[in-house]
Amino acid sequence: MLSSSHLKPSAPSATLLRFLRSQSDFLSVNSSRCARPSRSKPYVHQILPCNASSRASSTWTCTASAPHRTTLQTSLVRTPTPAARSHSSSRPRLWLCAGQAGRSSSIFPLSNAPYSRSASTKSRPLLRRLLDLRRSNSSADKHNRGGPALIDDGTEGGFTIGRGLAAKATNEPRLRCTEFDKNGNVTLVNGEFKKSELIAKYGLLPRDLRKIDSSTLPHILVRPSAILINLLHLRVLIKHDRVLVFDAYGSTDSYMQSLFVYDLEGKLQQKQTGGFGALPYEFRALEAVLISVTTGLEEEFNGVREPVVRVLRALEEDIDRDKLRHLLIYSKKLGTFEQKARLVRDAIDDLLEADDDLAAMYLTERANGVQREEDDHQEVEMLLESYHKVCDEIVQASGNLVTSIRNTEEVVKAILDANRNSLMLLDLKFSIGTLGLATGTLFSALYGMNLKNFIEESDLGFGAVSMTCFMITAVVCVYGLAKLRKLQRVRMWGEAGVGGAPLTPLTTRSGILSGHRSNWRADSIEPVWGSLPGEARTERIKRLRETAAAAAARSASADATAQRASALRSSANANGGAPKGSEHSPTRETEASGSSA
């Protein structure tokens, strides 16, 4: 048995504290002294560490110690379950009291220590005890199996961010490509590269690869050591001694891309002499790309143009609903193709307008240390201009076809409007005839009543009433048709034409056009307007006004000559006779004036 001498407890080692920390469930700070169990049972296992001078021993009776500073208490207590709570008094508990030391407090910061159960259960508030008793067995077992958290909560966010960045780096998208060396041989087929690897290997920027991934707008980008091309189905990276062809949309069985790979291999394997007109490595690759792009555009345009032309020819013969629907579908396809070809042409045009980019496309010379002036780029400019012309021709042809579709649609609308107007006129004619018959039968309905009309005994009553009804019907029909014809006659120059005189009317049905229906595609309408070929509207109006003024002047001069002749004749009659040779003078003067006019 140990005597109750005053012993100053020593601080436990760091290894022991870490072990107890890993095995304990809670960590608490006892501000006064080591609390002893509040149970009145005599058997409590308690250990008090002693100084180095005195050896510690264990006893079954609690030894009292003198008051000392706040100690650090660590307890190994299992979370009691409802079944084992009744036997908790018979189980020994291990209590360790240690003096507060500097190194122990530095190892376990008290500010971050979670709140734990006190040694005395009764010293806690009632609400905390009730909540503690309501814990489920599953949660307690899970908490005991999990062990204490050896990492502070403040560092969990950093580890979460690190795991997210690591997962993002692991899931970085890869680009599959085929690589050609300086001799045109394929060194890598369907090789996968990360974007970061391509950026570091070829000296690119992330935005450059973003433009390669995009499948909407064509681009030709010139960088200090590479040329990036994104045209239609091709995504190519050109170096001075290497070419990378990226897979189109992740597919390896593209027909156009396969043709391009074979063509590119043949272009790069051509032995170029050092004479005039020899193209460097990067220009041969660029030419292969442009040939593939223009060939694809031409084939696609031929595939779109043929059905459009066939539908347009069919619409000239018969305007059908199905044909109009097919025309709408082909018109949409043609519009999409025209936009695509226009974007390719604009991409080449933008490159031609940048002199610094054209001079920077000489990658072989730059790799050899040769610098070109900004205006010294005749070879690449001629190469790009030739294929720009091809793309421009395709754009113009597709634009002309789109214009033909628009014109055909307008003509079809005009024809359908004319047919609709004809049907409306026919309906109006039937309505006018029905109105005339209804007006005529009104009188017969009046005579059909059983009333006295004072003509029952007359022999001419039936005929007179019938003739009156027919006459009223005819008058109403003729009047209605006349009004309809007057409303149907619509002129672009008004009722009287230009200058109050009507224009030259069309030939009658008995004329040349009788029995012949002109085609709606006729280009000339001079007989309608009375104009000369190639004459503008303002010139035609001016000519018509001058003609009207000349006719008015001729009529005025003729009236003046007639008045002068009548005055001479009256004066001659007043003198009693006219001399010989003067009888026909007025007539001669009239003829002379007419010839002069």
From Swiss-Prot:
Location(s) in or outside the cell: Mitochondrion inner membrane
Using the UniProt annotation, give all residue ranges assigned to the region (Disordered): 552-597
* Major localization class: mitochondrion
Task: Output the superkingdom of the source species.
Answer: Eukaryota
**A cellular component annotation (GO) from this entry:** mitochondrial inner membrane
Q: Does the keyword Transmembrane apply?
A: yes
Entries under InterPro entries matching the protein = MRS2-like (IPR039204)
What range does the transit peptide cover? 1-56
Q: Quote the biased-composition stretches of kind Basic and acidic residues, using this chain's numbering.
A: 581-591
According to the UniProt entry, its GO molecular function terms are: magnesium ion transmembrane transporter activity
Q: Which residue ranges have biased composition labelled Low complexity?
A: 552-577
What Gene3D superfamilies does this protein's entry cite?
Answer: 2.40.128.330, Magnesium transport protein CorA, transmembrane region
Placement of sequence motif YGMN: 447-450
* Membrane topology, as annotated: Multi-pass membrane protein
Q: Which UniProt keywords apply?
A: Ion transport, Magnesium, Membrane, Mitochondrion, Mitochondrion inner membrane, Transit peptide, Transmembrane, Transmembrane helix, Transport
Q: Which CDD domains match?
A: Mrs2_Mfm1p-like
Q: Which GO terms describe its biological process?
A: mitochondrial magnesium ion transmembrane transport
Which protein family is it in?
Belongs to the CorA metal ion transporter (MIT) (TC 1.A.35) family.
What this chain does, per the record? High-conductance magnesium-selective channel that mediates the influx of magnesium into the mitochondrial matrix. Essential for the splicing of mRNA group II introns in mitochondria by affecting mitochondrial magnesium concentrations, which are critical for group II intron splicing. It also suppresses a variety of mitochondrial intron mutations and its absence may disturb the assembly of mitochondrial membrane complexes.
Q: How does it assemble?
A: Homopentamer. Forms homooligomers. Interacts with MFM1.
Q: What name has this protein been given in UniProt?
A: Mitochondrial inner membrane magnesium transporter mrs2
Species, as recorded = Aspergillus fumigatus (strain ATCC MYA-4609 / CBS 101355 / FGSC A1100 / Af293) (Neosartorya fumigata)
